[in-house]
Amino acid sequence: MSTDVTQLAMALIARPSVTPLDEGCQTLMGKHLSAAGFTLEPMVFEDTTNLWARRGTQAPVFCFAGHTDVVPIGDLARWHTPPFEPTIIDGYLHGRGAADMKGSLAAMLVATERFVAKHPHHNGSIAYLITSDEEGPFINGTTRVIDTLEARNEKITWALVGEPSSTYKLGDVVKNGRRGSLTGNLTVNGVQGHVAYPHLADNPIHKAAPALTELAQMHWDNGNEFFPPTSFQIANINGGTGASNVIPGNLEVMFNFRYSTEVTADELIARVLGILDAHGLDYDISWVFNGLPFLTGDGPLLEATKSAIREVTGYDTDPQTTGGTSDGRFIAPTGAQVIELGPVNATIHKVNECVKIADLEQLALCYEKLLEKLLC
């Protein structure tokens, strides 16, 4: 028989909230939170729906953070079940968003309801920061809510982001930090011409190749005990007209850094520009700052998370900083401690996304124990 957390997860999955749509997910969550004594503050910025909810007025503030939007379904023909008709098969809940991250949202709500029922006069405050713009351009979501909170000096002490952090079994990995992300959009300018008359043209591909090779082979830093060395990856290269007899007039290159706390974005930019200039390129470049690196070291949140997972699962978790970015990067700069704990991520963003029902039940227990350890 389905548990409360499973039923709630199914109700959320049934809402086709492909980013930046919310499709009523936050309204459903708000009903549960309002009944538990939370004050709701919807924040709508352009096409994005956000919810800030809080129970209590005192510090410390424990905040559950997450998103109601999901990625597109991909090829519908490859799904074994309709992606927005949640289905239970052999102990797994199938549907888009099951693992990323509507299962986590359901576990948060159930944990909160249970905790408040047992501890109606808990210490501090419990908050929720929920957005429908995590899988999209992340312009009008968590970052805008944080800006609003900062403007009125409303601080989060601890943030638990429900991203699917686990690798093989629930809680085997938590994320206690993330690398920074910096994207460069480079255009190398040349002169278009006929391939038979190269002296009348200037091939930007030939000119850029040595510089790109140097960038790809560059050792940026050694990393540290918490972060692997900084990674430079070329993501897209576009040049040419499609014809075999035309030298292109320009070359477009998109690349990305995932960088550690051993280097800053400004330092990376300076080194890239130095290499491009050293090769004598005529270029234009723009930068997109996707997020700063952050790290939550030993402290109340990490210790409580480790303890909660050990008590629920019987094994120790492994704090890591690997993987992509999350909305934790917008919360951490305020001074909050940030941890990501959620389901196994093996099927996220794939067709036939699913989550183990038993894991959702255990996740709710982990979240509840976290509240007990920090607010009791």
UniProtKB/Swiss-Prot annotation:
The keyword Metal-binding applies. Its EC number is 3.5.1.18. Pathway: Amino-acid biosynthesis; L-lysine biosynthesis via DAP pathway; LL-2,6-diaminopimelate from (S)-tetrahydrodipicolinate (succinylase route): step 3/3. Zn(2+) 2 binds at residues 100, 135, 349. Keywords: Amino-acid biosynthesis, Cobalt, Diaminopimelate biosynthesis, Hydrolase, Lysine biosynthesis, Metal-binding, Zinc. It holds the Pfam family M20_dimer. It comes from the Bacteria. Its cofactor is Zn(2+); Co(2+). It is an enzyme of class 3 (hydrolase). One of its GO terms (biological process) is diaminopimelate biosynthetic process. The keyword Amino-acid biosynthesis applies. It catalyses: N-succinyl-(2S,6S)-2,6-diaminopimelate + H2O = (2S,6S)-2,6-diaminopimelate + succinate. Zn(2+) 1 binds at residues 67, 100, 163. Binds 2 Zn(2+) or Co(2+) ions per subunit. GO terms for molecular function: acetylornithine deacetylase activity; cobalt ion binding; succinyl-diaminopimelate desuccinylase activity; zinc ion binding. The active site is at 69, 134 (proton acceptor). Homodimer. Belongs to the peptidase M20A family. DapE subfamily. Catalyzes the hydrolysis of N-succinyl-L,L-diaminopimelic acid (SDAP), forming succinate and LL-2,6-diaminopimelate (DAP), an intermediate involved in the bacterial biosynthesis of lysine and meso-diaminopimelic acid, an essential component of bacterial cell walls. This is Succinyl-diaminopimelate desuccinylase. It comes from Shewanella denitrificans (strain OS217 / ATCC BAA-1090 / DSM 15013).
